[in-house]
Amino acid sequence: SWNVSTACWTGSPVSESQVIPFWGPDQKELFSLMAQALDPEHAITAAMYALAPIKGRVLLDVGAGAGDRTIPYAELAAHVFALEPAPAALPLLRDRIASSGASNVTVVPAGAEAIPLEDNCVDVAYATWSYFFGPGSEPGLLEVERVVRPGGDLAIVQNHGHDELSRFWASTESECETWPPWFAKRGFDCEIVDTTWRFRTRDEALAVLEFLWGEPARRYVLEHDRVQFGYKVAIYHRRILEHLAERN
């Protein structure tokens, strides 16, 4: 029978220039706490599934990281290509896949700017907080569109700002303002999802938020004495009817 993983895979090596540092292996406990706290009601995933369904389809997971989202995707998708360039993340990703028993996931050690898959090879591409940070990510956008079949979907999740936590990354929130027009120019719709970071204890909230954003975050948690914090993301979605290079 036709094997999607071997039919699409070209085996090109990853370029070091595409690697964003991955801190999960050095801070495993904090990384785990953050993953548990983020979007506990799964509102983000539900919105992604509604915009770009993956049930029975071939999915490209751009920036798979340690596989926290890859494994749930594999429960629905026909096959998942887990694209991850960071060497530190790859052992965790492979271990997570092995322990889950998922047989329909192919790890692709590469970045978004040079995806070693054939043209028109996947039905859907997801990217959650990876690579697509507005201006400058055009090369990766062209590559992802190349591997998505006509009629397929691309869904990109990024911070929206204008929420309780964005006060701690002022420069990033300013950068977020440039993203909606950048994506809109390239044919993307945008859906805002209101969700939360919900920790089990104040100590967990202190540990994670202080690690991420320092003393201002620590003071905020202590002053407000709670474990849940408002958070908004933007999901940029586009149906791939024609490639970006053909439109511009």
Model-flagged regions — what are they?
Residues 5, 9-55, 68, 153-182:
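Conserved class I S-adenosyl-L-methionine
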Residues 60, 65-114:
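Class I SAM-dependent methyltransferase SAM/SAH-binding core
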Residues 113-125:
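A short acidic, Gly/Pro-enriched loop at the edge of an enzyme's catalytic core
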Residues 123-138:
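A short SAM/SAH-binding and catalytic strip from SAM-dependent methyltransferases
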Residues 138-150:
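A short glycine-rich, Lys/Arg-flanked "PGG" loop and its adjoining helix->strand segment in the class I
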